[in-house]
């Protein structure tokens, strides 16, 4: 495990990329702290409950790479934001408006990345006009901080390394590049572009689009990811 962590950390440093590994397989704050001590800027979680465990274990910066929906969970998100830097993915105007309303009531600001659908077809915004509209909405809200964008090419993660895999990732990166260009032209300049996984980071890193990579599974499953 230590060798895998060192190998991953060295790779991302060589590419001038921040490392924010996904901990859905890692699970424990103790291992997350080992990774952070080796150079990661924080972790990525799939669920609010995972983020709560990580914060309780002392992790100070967390991206929740899914939408937090419903007033009760948003209230928990607000509470967690008092204890650590929490960023969450968003892709829906109604949810963002609810987040802003509850954040105002709780006297906190919530950090968000807008998720762009770059081929996974599970979540994220597909149409450029919808993406720009959500950027504009967030810009007008007092308690939502726009930090950037997230795009996940997960449909390519399990493919064997081949021209087909590279073509799939290339198509995703082209979608991401176009979306970023359109947003920047309208004055929405991201600090963070998050994405990439253990099955794709070796290719994604060469496109120069991301500021941080979420690869975490390779901490354990080095044989699957050819470290």
What role is predicted for each listed range?
Residues 19-24, 192-194:
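Short glycine-rich phosphate-binding loop at a beta-alpha junction
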Residues 15, 106-108, 187:
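Glycine-rich phosphate-binding loop signature in dinucleotide/nucleotide-binding domains
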Residues 1-8, 15:
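N-terminal, Lys/Arg-enriched amphipathic/low-complexity engagement segments
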Residues 19, 110, 209-211:
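A generic secondary-structure signal marking the coil-to-beta-strand transition
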Residues 22-159:
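Active-site-proximal beta-alpha core segment in soluble small-molecule metabolic enzymes
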Residues 13-15, 206:
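Short hydrophobic "helix-edge" motifs at membrane interfaces and signal-peptide entry regions
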Residues 118-227:
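Active-site loop/helix belt of alpha/beta enzymes
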């Amino acid at each position: 495990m230590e060798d895998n962590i060192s190998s991953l950390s060295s790779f991302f440093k060589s590419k001038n990329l921040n490392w924010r590994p996904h901990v859905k397989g890692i699970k424990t704050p103790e291992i997350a702290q080992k990774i952070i001590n080796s150079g990661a800027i924080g972790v990525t979680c799939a669920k609010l409950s995972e983020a709560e465990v990580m914060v309780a274990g002392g992790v100070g910066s967390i991206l929740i790479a899914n939408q937090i929906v419903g007033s009760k969970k948003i209230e928990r998100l607000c509470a967690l934001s008092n204890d650590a830097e929490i960023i969450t993915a968003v892709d829906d105007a109604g949810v963002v408006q609810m987040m802003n309303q509850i954040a105002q009531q709780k006297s906190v600001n919530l950090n968000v990345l807008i998720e762009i659908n770059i081929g996974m077809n599970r979540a994220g915004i597909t149409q450029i006009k919808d993406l720009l509209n959500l950027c504009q909405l967030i810009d007008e809200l007092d308690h939502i901080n726009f930090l950037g964008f997230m795009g996940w090419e997960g449909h390519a993660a399990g493919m064997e390394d081949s021209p087909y895999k590279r073509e799939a990732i290339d198509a995703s990166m082209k979608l991401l590049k176009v979306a970023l260009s359109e947003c920047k032209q309208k004055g929405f300049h991201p600090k963070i572009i998050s994405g990439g996984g253990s099955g794709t980071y070796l290719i994604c890193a060469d496109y120069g689009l991301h500021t941080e990579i979420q690869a975490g599974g390779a901490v354990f499953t080095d044989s699957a990811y050819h470290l």
